[in-house]
Regions:
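Short, solvent-exposed loop/turn segments that connect beta-strands within catalytic domains
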Residues: 14-15, 30-33, 65, 157-160
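Short, solvent-exposed loop/hinge segments that bridge or flank secondary-structure elements
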Residues: 4-32
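N-terminal glycine/threonine-rich, aromatic-flanked beta-hairpin/loop signature
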Residues: 22-50
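Calycin-type beta-barrel ligand-binding domains and close structural analogs
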Residues: 2-8, 45-176
Length: 176
């Protein structure tokens, strides 16, 4: 899961998709309460201005073929964390108890027969407030070489108000 990812090829082939870069870096590697990752996403044209910054905590799921990805928001001014993925020890100064859990936004991933991890948020559980949205949905498929992520937001009537309407963003791993 850690590494640098880009959907540049997808964006070139289909103008409906913005070109996005995603960085995932391990943080707090000495902790024993799961694998912690700092995740930063930026438009390729504005790499120094990420539009999404999160912390993921990956813990064991209900069985040997599942994990739960707990999603957290960072506290305070997000600009102070921009580019943290470049550091040897990202977010070292931040303590996990300062993170803000995104209630209802956890993703349970299950390992399928093809060795892909597949999962999604629970329907109507992840609250959202931007673009007139009431809730958001995320679907994820991960392999060793790519992450497919389909984030969509809906208003209180169930009409989609943001996110791709045609399918997931396909991020290809560009480096570790």
């Amino acid at each position: 899961m850690t590494g640098n990812y880009s959907n540049e090829a997808q964006a070139k082939a289909d103008a409906k998709f913005d070109s996005i870069v995603m960085h995932m870096r391990p943080i707090w590697v000495d902790r024993i309460d799961g694998l912690w990752l700092y995740v930063e996403q930026s438009l390729s044209a504005t790499l120094d201005k990420p539009y999404r910054q999160r912390v993921y905590q990956i813990v064991d799921g209900n069985d040997a073929n599942s994990v739960e990805v707990r999603i957290y928001e960072l506290p305070g001014d997000l600009a102070q964390y921009a580019g943290a993925w470049k550091k040897d020890q990202p977010l070292r100064q931040l303590m996990p108890d300062l993170l803000v859990p995104r209630a209802g936004c956890n993703v349970t991933l299950r390992l399928d027969d093809s060795k892909a991890w597949i999962g999604s948020t629970e329907p109507n559980q992840c609250s959202a407030s931007s673009d007139g949205a009431s809730y958001s949905m995320s679907s994820v498929t991960m392999t060793q070489k790519e992450i497919q992520s389909w984030d969509r937001s809906y208003d209180s009537k169930g009409s989609q108000v943001s996110g791709s309407t045609t399918g997931p963003y396909i991020f290809i791993k560009t480096s570790r």
